[in-house]
Every structure is written in C-alpha cells, then in structure tokens.
C-alpha cells in the first residue's frame, strides 16, 4: 500500500497513456459533439493558471501541468465521451466510477486488517492512499451516486445487488472515518438529490444501511472502536476552521482583481474553496470562466431534472448525473476540487458531465425523430 501511494502519480500517468492509445482506436459513433461545454471553461481556468505559472513561476512545471491536464481532456474526448453511444456504455461509465470506490475501499480495508495505523490513518483520520483526509472524502463521496444507481437499477435481489449495497456501506463508513464535514455534506447532498422525487426509496435505503451497520459495527475490533468516537466529535464541532483562509483569499482578490495575488513560489497553491482560490490566484482571468463552468453544470442539472419529469424512464440515469454534479459542486465551496489537473474530482466531474451530455443528446435525437415522424404523416 505504501508503494502504491508513493508511485500513484506515475501509475496514473501510465494508465492515462494506455487509455489514450485505446481511445485512438475507437471509431466515431452517431454523436458528433462529445465534450460538454463546461469542460471548455474549465480548460480556460487551467489556461489562466498556466499563463500565471509560466510568467511568474516555474516554466517547467507550467508546461508539465498543461500537458497533464490536456492529456486528461483528450483521454475523456477519445475514450469515455466517444464510447457513450448507447445505454450499455452509459451503465459501464457509471460502473467504472463505482469501481474506483470499490478498489479504494477494499484495498484500504485489507490494509486496515493488517495494520490499521499504517498508511490508512493519519492523526486519527482515514486518508487511505491519498495525501489527506479531505482528498479521501472527496473520492469516496464522489462515487456514492454511482452506487445508488447500480443498487436501484438492479430490480432483483441477488449477490450482485448485495455486493453493491455492502460496498456502499463500506464507502459510507470510510467516509465517516475521514472526519471530513465537507465529505459528509457531499455524501448527504448526493443522496438527497438522487432521491429528490422518491422519498420512499430513500427511507428503505436508510433503514437497510442502518440495519447492516447495527450488525457489522459491533463485530469490529477495539482499534476501530477507539477511532470512531474522536472522529465522530469532529462532526459536531461548530468552529469554522476555514474562515481565516477564506478571508485571506478574498482580500487577495480585492487587492489584485484582474490577475490575482502575486505568485510567491514556483507554482500556484489552492485550498479550502474553488471559487475564492481561483479568484485570489488568477483574478477575473480565471474566476469568470470558472463561474461560467459552474453555471453550465447547473444548467445541465436542470435540463436532466426536466428530462426525468418528461420521460420517467430516464429517472435513474438523470438522477445519477444530477446527484453527482450536486455532490461535487457542494464540496467546491470548502475544498479546491476543480483546480487540480490529475485528481479524481476533476476526472469525475468530466465523466459526470460527459454522461449528462450523452443523455441530453439521446433526448434531442428522440425528439428530432418524433418530429420527423409527424412531418411524414
């Protein structure tokens, strides 16, 4: 596990390169425009970061970051976005995001059974193979909508459905162990948005998970019991630990509204809030496209919600994307989730947007077909 953490970025780059090669071999389908508009504005934000780092920071790092982010966008364009041509591939896209959570949770569960304090915990909070507990929380919460889709979409009770439910319970428990209030908000937001029109299904899921936790938690060893209480206390704290950072970011933006605060290191550093971090670091140059990206994501959420009302057959698919985007956007106000270039929040945002665009494209195609049929009569 320690070796995985130490070599995580190189392994990710290798996998990214393999996906690029695989994507290049994929033929075009019926969809022509594959990249959702919000991603273009996210690219504009990265361009602002690149320019500032290039002019005032480390030139080598600027080009490396730009190349990495460009490769991620190209991978999404050639791979997942192009593969989305039918319902089967949509479900594969959701499955792939869920499997990120499965691999992460089960790998760290295995490590915890061997030695709970090696790698998986730092300062009493779960971090897994990530850099800190906030990163772990963002990864775990970002996969919750996909688990709910896989559970609700499988009508019959079998081992596969039990596996997804068990995985969601494990994801939820590790999310609790991060002690991250941001992660808790993201997870709760995703659940509420997913079941926004089906309160009965939400109650059944909560009761089922509650029963499973009541059975499983007493079976955990004493080390887990000693960890639970200090972590639980973090969720009842009312202290705003980010107020000083937010105030500093706001003042940095007010003092340098066009291009942000002067760069004092080799690269830009971000934290605590996507919007304030972008404003403080890049000024209006990066803040404006970031806001447009956020508004574009909200516009997609509204369009998908309306789609689920008009065509209930797409309720599960639409709810997965709506809850996924809501989850990430809610977390963006307390963590700089969208300003990285090779992070799970950025990649999952692109995947959710690509999945959402596919659903809207399908709806547009169906509407055009129905219009054509009416003109033929």
PLM feature spans:
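Transmembrane alpha-helices of multi-pass inner-membrane enzymes
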Residues: 18-19, 321-331, 336-377
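Hydrophobic core segments of transmembrane alpha-helices in multi-pass, intramembrane catalytic enzymes
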Residues: 9-19, 63-77, 111, 134-150, ...
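TM-adjacent membrane-interface loops and short helices in multi-pass inner/ER membrane proteins
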Residues: 236-278, 282-289
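Flexible juxtamembrane loops connecting transmembrane helices in multi-pass membrane enzymes
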Residues: 123-126, 214-247, 265-266
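Hydrophobic transmembrane alpha-helices and their immediate junctions
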Residues: 158, 195-196, 284-329, 362
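Transmembrane signal-anchor hairpin modules in multi-pass inner-membrane enzymes, especially those
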Residues: 1-54, 87-91, 95, 151-160, ...
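Alpha-helical transmembrane segments of multi-pass inner-membrane proteins
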Residues: 50, 91-118, 131-197, 295-303, ...
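Transmembrane alpha-helical segments and their membrane-water interfaces
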Residues: 17-30, 44-45, 49-106, 146, ...
